Amino acid sequence: MEVRDYIALADNLRTERAAFEGGWDEMRRIIMPRATGNAHPDSVPDNGGGLEHSDVANNSLKKLASAHLTYITPLDRRWFTLRPVGYKKDGNQTLNDWYNKATEVMERELAISNFYSVMHEVYLDRCLTGTGCMFSEMNLNKQLIFRHIPTGTYAIAESESGDVDTLVRWFRLTAHQAAQKWGEEALGAKVRRALKDAKRRYTDSFEFVQCVLPNQAGRLLSNNLPAKKRPWQDVIISLDDKKIVFESGFYEFPFLVTRFLRWGDSPYGVSPAWHARRTIRMAIDMEKILYTLGQTKAYPRLFLLASQYGDVDLRAGGQTTISAEAA
């Protein structure tokens, strides 16, 4: 595939996703405004005075996400166990011991990584928009690191079995960050020019798209395959320069994509918040009405004679002396 083919793939998947974006933005706005900053990093926080979202819905969302964290992936107890194919409790003890040890190693590595804090963000997305996503990789110290991918910044497609096996995501980096990540020689002309400009190096950001999709030529034959023979392709493109800045592959699909409930044949999920939108909007509108009524009751509208302008004491318990003619 050429650069234009990857860009076309990403654009087509984004077009398919567009039908859900309005609902996602509305749910963020009325339930969890903070999530808007995740999905739209360039947006400016909106000071709605506390009347644009529901605190009750926000607390309910947090409780549901916390329940996911407590019962699905609890930090204080084992929630997964590795077993060999055809496992028998009284079978090959050496084999069973190896898998038990592997389970302990995985538990320890997850505990010292950022897995649980990132998983909390994923659960919030899952309960708010119906779809949550997390990316896993190794850092420079060969330790596990996880990244929350906010709903609205990626698009997905499924395999014939209904599993997500294709994902494209859009993100922005400054020229300085891009050079750190891939090296100056991998960057396109526009990014390199910004990198050499002291005023733009740390401030001008550029858009990139990462495409992870099945590799038709890939086979999981060993754990020492060249990138082009691994089961999944990984391509990152600079959209400003229309240039591939990084190309590699994965042995396993590196994204976890979880859906609360399914909506027909769409790869995207549906959350409880989706069905509660009408009730939440009504509650917000009612709160605004009660707020307005309270303001009107506390500070009623007054008719004043022109000659009284500036002489009426509007403070609590204030007294205004008027003439008999004005009365």
Task: Tell what function each PLM region has.
Residues 219-327:
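Extended, charged amphipathic alpha-helical segments
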